[in-house]
Structures are given as C-alpha cells and as structure tokens.
Amino acid sequence: MEGEMQRHIKLTKAQTTPVVLVVGDPGRVDKVKVLCDSYVDLAYNREYKSVECTYKGQKFLCVSHGVGSAGCAICFEELMNNGAKVIIRAGSCGSLQPTQMKRGDICICNAAVREDRVSHLMIYSDFPAVADYEVYATLNQVAEELKVPVFNGISLSSDMYYPHKIIPTRLEDYSKANVAVVEMEVATLMVMGTLRKVKTGGIFIVDGCPLKWDEGDFDNNLVPERLENMIKISLETCARLAKKY
C-alpha cells in the first residue's frame, strides 16, 4: 500500500523514489543535501536518515544506512520493498593498494568480496557480488566528464573493522590478490540487488590504508574538495538514472 510505512526507515512507498543514493553516516546526508538544488527532510530513525533531493530537475532520495552489513541490509530491504529500482552506495574506504591509491582518491567498484555475514544467509557463498553495469558505466562516464580521476576495482566488504589477535585479518592476502579497497557494505547491497533485480553500484573515497594503521595512515577528516567531487559524481549519476527509471 502507498501509505504503509517501512518499520525502520520510516518511509512509505509514496515517499520512495526509484533512484536512491545511500551513505553510511547520517551526517553525510547533510553534506549531500546542501549540494542539491533543493531538498526536503523526510525521516530520521536510528541510523536511518532520509532526504528527498532535487538535482538538475530530477528527484531521488539520499538515505543513511549506518555501519555494517546487518543494519544496512535492513535499509536496503525496506527501500526495495518500497519500489527502489536503483541504489548507489557512496562512502569512505581504506586503500588496499597504497602505492597506487592514496587518501582522497576515489574508487568506483565493479564487484566485491563477500566478507560480510548477512548475504551468506540469503544465498550460497559461491554467489558473486557484482555491480550493475549501467550504474558502473554511468559513474565512470560522469567522473570523466567532470574531469575527476578515479580508480576502478574490487572492494572487500568486511564485517571486521578492528582486527583481533586470535584470528588474523585477510587484508594482506586480498591486497596481494589486487583487491582495491576495503569497506563494509557494498557486497551486501550488490547481492541483494541481484536477488531483487535492483540495479546497484558503489563509489568510495579513500580515508587511509588499514595495512599502515600503525604508521598513522588514517584520517576521516577528508579534504572537502575531494569529498565534494565524490558527492557530485554520485548526484549527477543519480539524476541521469532518474530520467530513465
């Protein structure tokens, strides 16, 4: 029903646009909305904050999903229940290729390693996490037109943020396997998108390198211009896809 509200994101079908930009941090929703032509605040419950954005005449939502696969899966499920057709995640990441990708660089991901938990409860572990090609291609096309250099590659989506001593992380192994970046949610999004026939993709800005944390290679106070570049690529991509879906 149009008026039925989803339990956690507190949005109805009537409020949910076909194209949605998702971010982890509710505070980043505020950074996104001020770059739009106009916006309307919609809801804020738990980690799920939502805004209707208007950018270049096109309407789409920006919604925060919090940290980690379980919480973000709730957000994605409820958006899909409400009829979302395209969901793009824009967030921060760590570089697993520190000689190539430095703090402030942008990576558009074509696939992800499923080191989450929730997607394995949805479908077999052999099932791939891949971006929709149209979303991936549009993100890259927009970046090229805006003259913003970007990297492409695979993301490791891991439920582990702080490493522990008993079981070592696999970061070094995935780095050697040429995985580009590490974050926490896009694999879940990609798997859910494929299962639900929803187009998905991911774009990320590097805030450091977890392979070099002991050397102090981390700073989430990202250069505003670099962060704004990632947001502008995301907004333009959402606007273009909103014309079609």
Curated annotation (Swiss-Prot):
Q: Which residues bind a purine D-ribonucleoside?
A: H8, M184, E185
Which keywords fit this entry according to its UniProt record?
Answer: Glycosyltransferase, Purine salvage, Transferase
Q: What does this protein do?
A: As part of the purine salvage pathway, catalyzes the phosphorolytic breakdown of the N-glycosidic bond in the beta-(deoxy)ribonucleoside molecules, with the formation of the corresponding free purine bases and pentose-1-phosphate. Preferentially acts on inosine and guanosine, and to a lesser extent on 2'-deoxyinosine and 2'-deoxyguanosine.
Gene3D superfamilies, from UniProt?
Nucleoside phosphorylase domain
The name on file for this protein is: Purine nucleoside phosphorylase
Gene Ontology terms describing biological process: inosine catabolic process; purine nucleotide catabolic process; purine ribonucleoside salvage; uridine catabolic process
Which SUPFAM superfamilies does this entry report, sorted A to Z? Purine and uridine phosphorylases
- Molecular functions (GO terms): purine-nucleoside phosphorylase activity; uridine phosphorylase activity
Look up and give the organism this protein is from: Plasmodium vivax (strain Salvador I)
InterPro entries registered for this protein in UniProt = Nucleoside_phosphorylase_d (IPR000845), Nucleoside_phosphorylase_sf (IPR035994)
Name of the gene? PNP
Please list the disulfide bridges: none
Show the GO cellular component annotation of the record.
cytosol
Family to which the UniProt record says this protein belongs? Belongs to the PNP/MTAP phosphorylase family.
Q: In which pathway does it act?
A: Purine metabolism; purine nucleoside salvage
Question: What are the EC numbers?
Answer: 2.4.2.1
Q: Which residues bind phosphate?
A: G24, D25, P26, G27, R28, R46, R89, A90, G91, S92
UniProt cross-references to CDD domains, sorted A to Z = UP_EcUdp-like
